[in-house]
Amino acid sequence: MEIVQNFSSAALTTGILLGCLGVIFLPSIVYAAFLLGAVFFCLAGIYVLLHADFVAAAQVLVYVGAINVLILFAIMLVNPQDAPPRALDSPPLIPGIACIGLLGVLVQMISTTSWLTPPWTPEPNSLPVLGGHLFSDCLLAFEVMSLVLLVALVGAIVLARREPVERSS
């Protein structure tokens, strides 16, 4: 059974890495959006391997079913033209320095991390614990997020129902 989990974990991780590289390097934004959905599915598979079934289902419903579809609708509404990319006005010195700095931090974190951890057994049903934390410790953040989503929904409805303004010449 452990060999199946190791293979599944390696396959899902490879899918995540290849999908992320495709999102970054593909010239078509539509293909990049579809690959982002594949990355979200692979991440849900990782959650299933970690016995977090509810989080995996929420990942698929929220990120694949809502966020990724929203990104695809935005791409279709904007209708990106196949214009050639602009040339950089200046050399990418600042982003290069930032990337080298982040690489240094990453190498330092990897070299100082203790990778030997004790074996961990997940709780068979962690949903009540998650619900308890969500509605006790994180109640304010949960309510603020629900208000932000409500405002975003009302704003989207107002923008979608707006009548075009006719100009007289």
From Swiss-Prot:
GO terms for cellular component: chloroplast thylakoid membrane. The chain crosses the membrane at residues 7-27, 29-49, 58-78, 90-110, 139-159. It is a multi-pass membrane protein. It is found in: Plastid, Chloroplast thylakoid membrane. Belongs to the complex I subunit 6 family. It catalyses: a plastoquinone + NADH + (n+1) H(+)(in) = a plastoquinol + NAD(+) + n H(+)(out); a plastoquinone + NADPH + (n+1) H(+)(in) = a plastoquinol + NADP(+) + n H(+)(out). NDH shuttles electrons from NAD(P)H:plastoquinone, via FMN and iron-sulfur (Fe-S) centers, to quinones in the photosynthetic chain and possibly in a chloroplast respiratory chain. The immediate electron acceptor for the enzyme in this species is believed to be plastoquinone. Couples the redox reaction to proton translocation, and thus conserves the redox energy in a proton gradient. Keywords: Chloroplast, Membrane, NAD, NADP, Plastid, Plastoquinone, Quinone, Thylakoid, Translocase, Transmembrane, Transmembrane helix, Transport. The gene is ndhG. It comes from the Eukaryota. Signal peptide: none annotated. GO terms for molecular function: NADH dehydrogenase (ubiquinone) activity; quinone binding. This is NAD(P)H-quinone oxidoreductase subunit 6, chloroplastic. Its EC number is 7.1.1.-. NDH is composed of at least 16 different subunits, 5 of which are encoded in the nucleus.
